[in-house]
Curated annotation (Swiss-Prot):
GO terms for cellular component: cytosol. Pathway: Amino-acid biosynthesis; L-arginine biosynthesis; L-arginine from L-ornithine and carbamoyl phosphate: step 3/3. The keyword Cell membrane does not apply. This is Argininosuccinate lyase. GO terms for molecular function: argininosuccinate lyase activity. It comes from the Bacteria. One of its GO terms (biological process) is L-arginine biosynthetic process. It is found in: Cytoplasm. Keywords: Amino-acid biosynthesis, Arginine biosynthesis, Cytoplasm, Lyase.
Length: 461
């Protein structure tokens, strides 16, 4: 980096090349270029609107910035490391295009409020894209759920068989996690959508700017009321990273289940060739790389959140160079969440198949219907805690006899308690066990059908 920087006139010697490279951010903040151009166009329009520059100069600046946009999109404008950052790169190219008028663009503006504006414009756009992806993920979950309302799957607590549930009910749990993610992003958006433009370096400006005018042009909901806060606030980025981390938590939990379900020990799903890989040495293998990568990338997003919190915890007001470190983790988190949502949506839609016969067998090979025996007795007047103890004896008797509950004879049942009758067999059948849980939000088929319909309405379908 040999070219002098805009700020270098106060200095007598050039920046050491290694320090210049260390200081530069153009390698990653180029991600903001389209947003920087948009923000600069609004700033130029405001300068003309308030009479700080002439209308003709404002038009020149806006047109020059638009030319840079086209050059960038066509691959003709690719600033190098000598630009230091995207803001200087744009300003330098603008001056080449429109001449000295380009040097007026930065009037009444600092890179501090400029980068804050760019980052908010970027994140606002990315939040909207992620919300769209979440909706598609939810639609795919609902499509599968709709087809599997009466498909049974073992339900687990402590990763031990607990009670059978509807497969649709299980998938709807992830739908509602995604719904909270969607709503949470909307809440974050409100605090992203605040304009710092016009806050200057930290104290505002002596020029008669109109901050509300630029906020309106850029479709910000409101402006920062305090210039110090405006240039130093990164709460919005931390909030986004929190929301992104929760999205990844939910995707990772689903990934973990798919990994288990695809194993030979579970055999609940089959991974299709389009979404699985093989082993370089073991030819029989079909590896669940997609969910494993999602699970692994979750830690990456968590790390960026932790890094941002640590960056911010000791910063005095207002702007500090530490804040340059807010971008790489933010950009990577955005890209990671988007990639994981896309991959998991494809996996669910095209890459796995539930083995319904295996699932049907699985729910008949355990004692997950034991709670229903206690409910059976309680419905016949036996106090639940007493019924609970009786069922413990039933399970103990069954294990000793090498039987499941369904295999006990009526005599064996009645030896344990006289309240048992022939209808006990229907009461403990997996299908009846699921169907009977018809409380609101439960796994009963009627409730799940209603829940699928309600979920469709919730996402506007």
């Amino acid at each position: 980096m040999t070219e002098k920087q805009t700020w270098s006139q106060r200095f007598e010697s050039a920046l050491h090349p290694a320090i210049a490279l260390f200081n530069a951010s153009i390698s990653f903040d180029i991600e903001l270029i389209e947003y920087d151009l948009t923000g600069s166009q609004a700033h130029a329009q405001m300068l003309a609107h308030t009479g700080i520059i002439s209308p003709a100069e404002g038009e020149q600046l806006v047109a020059g910035l638009e030319q840079i946009r086209e050059e960038y999109r066509q691959g003709k404008f690719q600033p190098g490391i000598d630009a230091e950052d995207v803001h200087f790169a744009v300003e330098r190219r603008l001056t080449e295009i429109v001449g000295d008028v380009g040097k007026k663009l930065h009037t009444a503006r600092s890179r501090n409020d400029q980068v804050g504006t760019d980052t908010r414009l970027y994140l606002r756009d990315q939040i909207s894209q992620i919300k769209t992806q979440l909706r598609e993920f939810q639609r795919v979950l609902l499509d599968i759920a709709e087809q599997n309302v009466e498909t049974l799957i073992p339900g687990y607590t402590h990763l031990q068989r607990a009670q059978p549930v509807s497969l649709a009910h299980h998938l709807l749990a992830y739908f509602h996690m995604a719904q909270r993610d969607w709503e949470r992003l909307g809440d974050v958006y409100r605090r992203v959508n605040i304009s710092p433009l016009g806050c200057g370096a930290l104290a505002g400006t002596t020029f008669p700017i109109d901050r509300h005018y630029t906020a309106k042009l850029l479709q910000f909901e409101r402006i920062y009321e305090n210039s110090l806060d405006g240039v130093s606030d990164r709460d919005f980025a931390i909030e986004f990273l929190c929301a992104a981390s929760l999205i990844m938590v939910h995707l990772s939990r689903l990934s973990e289940e798919i990994i288990l379900w695809a194993s030979e020990e579970f055999r609940f799903v089959t991974l299709k060739d389009s979404c699985a890989t093989g082993s370089s040495i073991m030819p029989q293998k079909k590896n669940p790389d997609v969910p494993e990568l999602v699970r692994g990338k979750t830690g990456r997003v968590f790390g960026h959140l932790q890094a941002m919190l640590v960056i911010m915890k000791g910063l005095p007001l207002a702007y500090n160079k530490d804040l340059q470190e807010d971008k790489e983790g933010l950009f990577d988190s955005v890209n990671t969440v988007k990639a994981c949502l896309e991959a998991m949506t494809i996996l669910l839609q095209e890459g796995l198949e539930f083995r319904t016969q295996r699932l049907a067998e699985a729910v008949t090979q355990d004692f997950s219907n034991a709670t229903d025996v206690a409910d059976y007795l309680a419905a016949r007047g036996v106090p639940f805690r007493e019924a609970y103890n009786i069922v413990g004896k039933v399970v103990k008797t069954s294990i000793a006899a090498g039987k499941l509950l369904k295999d006990l004879t009526l005599e064996e049942w009645q030896e344990i308690h006289p309240a048992f009758a022939t209808d006990i067999y229907e009461a403990i059948s997996p299908r009846q066990v699921v169907a009977a849980r018809n409380s609101y939000g439960g796994t009963g088929f009627a409730q799940v059908s209603k829940a699928v319909s309600a979920a469709r309405e919730e996402i506007g379908e």
